[in-house]
């Protein structure tokens, strides 16, 4: 089968220190410090056979993630932008859904409690956690000490087929009755990024009390999905800051109640105006530009009457936050980081939300073939109008 794979050179920056979980020349948790001169190649690979607990899946839809873009995008010295766990060469693609082709005898379907049957529609977690290390045993699989990531450190779903252990799979058969088969798979490919948003605002951010105001900075897929989740959770004002007009309109269709163009308006002042000086109970930083947006974050906290605001940092960025501790102390505010989507009932809760009518499909703004991936990865480095480009043809 044909795959879209990324190759890069292991060439550590002078300040890079090999971590205890890094593997010299193979993998690192600090991708932007090591990998240089990335290239996309179409590579033929064997389909393979699933093991006893594994499932062979025919991929029906796979989203192009901003992380994929940043693994190809480089700085002036040729180093990739993506700062996280990576191992190359690797077939990209982690936001996918598909249908079961074949399953091992011990590959158990969580929906039925029995072995997976061929034809079951599924999506998958991207975080491949071990279940044995201390973080996993403590209930924090997103921080597994032996973590692998589909499409980052092990082969992903920019291919017609993928083999995944059943423990990371979730049935999306519940989408079929409400949405039909084609839309079922499109929505299935959005479960992963929507779960990243859910983990950020509900699990790590602690959720909200119905009637609270929230601010979302950035309307990429995670920011947009957060609008849908928080509106469904009972937020009063869901205020989105996003420079792209098309993204603002899309976000309004799935949950945002107010939108701000940060290129034309002062974000903090507009938030305080919309909330009549109250501010927000939760702020999501989903831009990846904390040094630019943080002044607005602190002004909302400092001048708003709301106490105990939680700021959740979800966008991956090799950038320092210009934090003022006094603002957090006086206003009893919190800053937390969010990574991943595994555990805590996140995937099944997101699937339940979509099954019962939370429609995040407006995020998909373009459908492409496998051959078109590279040019779209390049275009997305500068194009802010597309939200989610999705591969639907893998021939």
Each language-model region and where it sits:
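C-terminal hydrophobic helical "lid"/dimerization subdomain
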Residues: 17, 284, 294-306, 343-395
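Glycine-rich beta-strand-centered segment in the early N-terminal region that forms part
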Residues: 46-62, 77-134, 176
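NAD(P)H dinucleotide-binding glycine-rich loop of Rossmann-like/cofactor-binding domains
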Residues: 83-94, 109-110, 130-213, 217
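Mid-domain Rossmann-like dinucleotide-binding core that forms the NAD(H)/NADP(H) cofactor-binding site
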Residues: 180-264, 269
């Amino acid at each position: 089968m044909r795959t879209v794979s990324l190759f890069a050179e292991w060439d550590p920056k002078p300040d890079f220190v090999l971590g205890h979980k890094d593997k010299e020349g193979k993998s690192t948790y600090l991708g932007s410090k090591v990998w240089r001169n990335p290239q996309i190649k179409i590579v033929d690979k064997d389909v393979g056979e699933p093991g006893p607990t594994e499932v062979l899946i025919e991929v029906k839809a796979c989203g192009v993630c901003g992380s994929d873009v940043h693994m190809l995008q480089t700085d002036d010295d040729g180093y990739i932008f993506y700062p996280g766990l990576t191992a190359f060469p690797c077939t990209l693609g982690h936001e996918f859904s598909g249908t079961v082709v074949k399953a091992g005898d011990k590959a158990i379907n969580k929906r039925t409690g029995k072995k997976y049957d061929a034809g079951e529609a599924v999506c998958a977690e991207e975080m491949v956690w071990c279940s044995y290390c201390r973080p996993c045993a403590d209930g924090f699989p997103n921080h597994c000490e032996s973590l692998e990531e589909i499409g980052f450190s092990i082969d992903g779903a920019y291919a017609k087929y993928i083999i995944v252990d059943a423990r990371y799979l979730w049935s999306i058969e519940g989408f079929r009755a409400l949405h039909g088969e084609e839309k079922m798979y499109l929505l299935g490919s959005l479960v992963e990024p929507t779960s990243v948003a859910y983990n950020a605002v509900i699990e790590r951010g602690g959720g909200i009390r119905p009637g609270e105001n929230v601010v979302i900075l950035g309307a990429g897929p995670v920011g947009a999905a957060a609008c849908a989740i928080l509106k469904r959770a009972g937020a009063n004002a869901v205020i989105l800051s996003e420079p792209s007009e098309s993204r603002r309109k899309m976000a309004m269709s799935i949950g945002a109640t107010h939108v701000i163009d940060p290129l034309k308006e002062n974000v903090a002042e507009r938030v305080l105006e919309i909330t009549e000086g109250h501010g927000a109970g939760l702020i999501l930083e989903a831009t990846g530009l904390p040094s630019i947006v943080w002044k607005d974050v602190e002004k909302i906290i400092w001048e708003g009457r709301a106490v105990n605001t939680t700021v959740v940092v979800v966008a991956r960025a090799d950038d320092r936050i210009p934090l003022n501790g006094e603002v957090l102390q006086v206003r009893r505010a919190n800053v937390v980081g969010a990574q991943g989507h595994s555990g805590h009932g996140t995937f099944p809760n997101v699937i339940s939300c979509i099954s019962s009518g939370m429609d995040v499909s407006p995020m998909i703004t373009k459908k492409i073939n496998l051959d078109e991936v590279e040019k779209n990865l390049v275009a997305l480095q500068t194009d802010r109008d597309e939200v989610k480009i999705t591969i639907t043809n893998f021939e």
